[in-house]
A protein has these predicted regions:
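PAPS-dependent sulfotransferase catalytic core
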Residues: 5-90, 155-177, 241-274
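Alpha-helical transmembrane segments
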Residues: 272-286
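Short, low-complexity, Lys/Arg-enriched N-terminal segments of secretory-pathway carbohydrate enzymes
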Residues: 290-297
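Glycine-rich phosphate-binding loop used to anchor ATP phosphates in small-molecule kinases
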Residues: 94-113, 118, 126
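The conserved 3'-phosphoadenosine-5'-phosphosulfate
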Residues: 54, 124-137, 141, 152-154, ...
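PAPS-dependent sulfotransferase catalytic domain
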Residues: 60, 64-65, 112-196, 239
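Short, well-ordered alpha-helical microsegments
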Residues: 29, 107-112, 134, 229-233
């Protein structure tokens, strides 16, 4: 079915986005997703793209899931970015048809447009020390998008199947454009951010500053991960705070486990054919170097 380029009304069919997560990934966005769901919201997160959402936090994808990966809503988000670039109001109905809250990438990269479409939404800006954020991203995202070792590059280029590689490249192109637009850095790339701490930290600071300067104070909660919890979040959203502890999910350690699976599959993809090739070559060399048998007279 062709993707629609029609301008979407701000309040289509009465479906509204009630909460917009404007914080960068790795600032506690999955914990926020889990908390919002506990408070009664239905929350969109990048894990929806990957199909690895759990109520108690994201989980590692299975090899079969990665082999069948098709990219979820990625093309819809790419179209959102293209429409914004072309000056066309994006259509977020694919989001609000099922969800009433959205956090993390890719939705966080479009928080200004989401707020314009849903002006009554509350905005939660999850924040973190920018240098600690850089360390977390460099230990997690950067490996997944192939900005790390050669083995990490193999993850994005030759493991699983072609759709994963296409998704990764689309993510880097479209989401980097959206990020660059927000932080005022035309040509921004996540690969450079992964390899240049000063470049990345400047972008993180610019991102947070733009949110704080744009969103009306009565609609914005600056949520410091590790310091704030249900008390602040529930009061801001006008709901009752649960008695359970605020969740802590998708930590760097958990992300490392996902990365281990990716690297293991990459190693199988590269290592097994290489091992077979070496064995075949060795057999050929042995045969080629064998001495012919001579008859005894």
């Amino acid at each position: 079915m062709a993707l629609s380029l029609l301008i979407a009304p701000a309040a289509a069919a009465g479906k509204q986005l009630k909460v917009i997560g404007a914080g960068m990934g790795r600032t506690g966005t999955d914990s926020l997703r889990t908390a919002l769901n506990e408070l009664g919201f239905k929350t969109y997160h990048m894990c929806e793209l990957l199909g690895i959402c759990n109520e108690g936090g994201t989980r590692a994808p299975s090899p079969l899931e990665m082999l069948g990966f098709e990219g979820g809503h990625n093309e819809l988000w790419a179209e959102v970015n293209r429409n914004i670039t072309a000056g066309v109001e994006p259509d977020f109905s694919f989001l609000t048809d099922e969800f009433n809250a959205a956090v993390d990438f890719p939705s966080a990269a479009f928080w200004p447009e989401l707020l314009k479409a849903y002006p009554n939404a509350k905005v939660v800006l999850t924040v973190r020390d920018p240098h600690k954020l850089y360390k977390s991203i460099s230990n997690a995202w950067c490996h997944i998008i192939g900005a790390g070792t050669l083995l990490d590059q193999a993850v994005t280029e030759i493991t699983f199947n072609r759709p994963w590689g296409r998704w990764n490249r689309a993510m880097q192109i479209e989401w980097a454009k959206a990020t660059g637009r927000l932080v005022g850095v035309p040509g921004f790339t996540w690969v450079q951010a992964c390899n240049d701490e000063a470049y990345a930290v400047a972008a993180f600071k610019a991102w947070d500053a733009k949110v704080k300067a744009t969103v009306p104070a009565d609609q914005l909660l600056v949520f410091e991960t590790g310091k704030h919890g249900y008390t602040e979040l529930a009061a801001f959203l006008g709901v009752k705070a649960p008695t359970t502890p605020y969740p802590h999910t998708n930590s760097t350690a958990e992300f490392t486990f996902v990365l281990f699976i990716f690297r293991f599959l990459a190693l199988l993809t590269v290592g097994v054919p290489a091992l077979l090739a070496c064995c075949c070559l060795r057999c050929c060399l042995r045969r080629g170097g064998a001495k012919p048998k001579t008859k005894r007279g």
